[in-house]
Amino acid sequence: MKTIMLCAICSVTQGNCVEDCAYCTQSAKAGADITKFKEKSVQQVVDEAKMAYKNHALGFCLVTSGARLNDKKTDYIASLARAVHKEVPNLMLIACNGMATYEQLCELKNAGIFSYNHNLETSREYFPKICTTHSWDERYQTNLDAKRAGLMLCTGGIYGVGESEADRVSFRASLKELEPFSSPINFFIRSDALRLDQPPLSADEALKIVRETKSALPETRVMIAGGREKILGERQYEIFENGADAIVIGDYLTAKGEKASKDIEELTKRGFSFASICH
């Protein structure tokens, strides 16, 4: 019986991001019709954490919109982490808050954050094609600082944004340098609101990406996140035969995901168990 890790996302601030990431509907430049809000209440976040834990999630990720942390946002995330840790102590708390300083990351670590998620997204060479308002090097440095602060590292990216095979190889080589604890794979889903217009990946290509990622990062938990349901469809649970160790359950940031109950039912039927402790 294979044990897999489930992770849930909690979007605690959403929309109105001034960055121009071509794949992201939260960018104000995209003009996407999404729900926007500044800060969820502490109680709402705690309630979502309790539901995630009830649905067998081990990871619970506190996600903010925007390019980077500032002192106010850092204090907010730290307060959420303390509240969730008090009410649901067995959850592994992850923060995904953009670029950050070493000092800010230390504050999150001290508040009970276990892991920091900041994706490289793609290769250093291709990144300027999909984002011009900040650099790939800034992202890489945040990952280094997260490790230095004692946080476990969660970094991955998005496929199907027009990158070449050489870009994919370069991207995975950069991930390997960072030796992340976990690495999320997202598959791009086209939206009329986005300037990026790329055809969807085939299921075969998506599964090949999973295999190649696990081959490049054998000691890392490979997590399949955005696009799993739409790109893979009925073949989505084949990801585990191809090297995946974890999935995101429930909804994503601005997109609906599979119902957690359906994932749990299908995975249980296939003989999987769910990680309840992080090691």
Swiss-Prot record:
Transmembrane segments: none
Pathway field: Cofactor biosynthesis; biotin biosynthesis; biotin from 7,8-diaminononanoate: step 2/2
Gene Ontology biological process terms from the UniProt entry: biotin biosynthetic process
GO molecular function annotation: 2 iron, 2 sulfur cluster binding; 4 iron, 4 sulfur cluster binding; biotin synthase activity; iron ion binding
Stretches assigned to the Radical SAM core domain: 2-228
EC numbers on record: 2.8.1.6
Catalytic activity: (4R,5S)-dethiobiotin + (sulfur carrier)-SH + 2 reduced [2Fe-2S]-[ferredoxin] + 2 S-adenosyl-L-methionine = (sulfur carrier)-H + biotin + 2 5'-deoxyadenosine + 2 L-methionine + 2 oxidized [2Fe-2S]-[ferredoxin]
Binding-site residues, [2Fe-2S] cluster: 61, 96, 154, 221
InterPro entries: Aldolase_TIM, BATS_dom, Biotin_synth/BioAB, Biotin_synthase, Elp3/MiaA/NifB-like_rSAM, rSAM
NCBIfam families hit by this protein: bioB, PRK08508.1
Protein's job: Catalyzes the conversion of dethiobiotin (DTB) to biotin by the insertion of a sulfur atom into dethiobiotin via a radical-based mechanism.
HAMAP family on file: BioB (MF_01694)
Protein name as catalogued: Biotin synthase
Organism in which the protein naturally occurs: Campylobacter concisus (strain 13826)
Organism phylogeny: Bacteria, Pseudomonadati, Campylobacterota, Epsilonproteobacteria, Campylobacterales
Gene: bioB
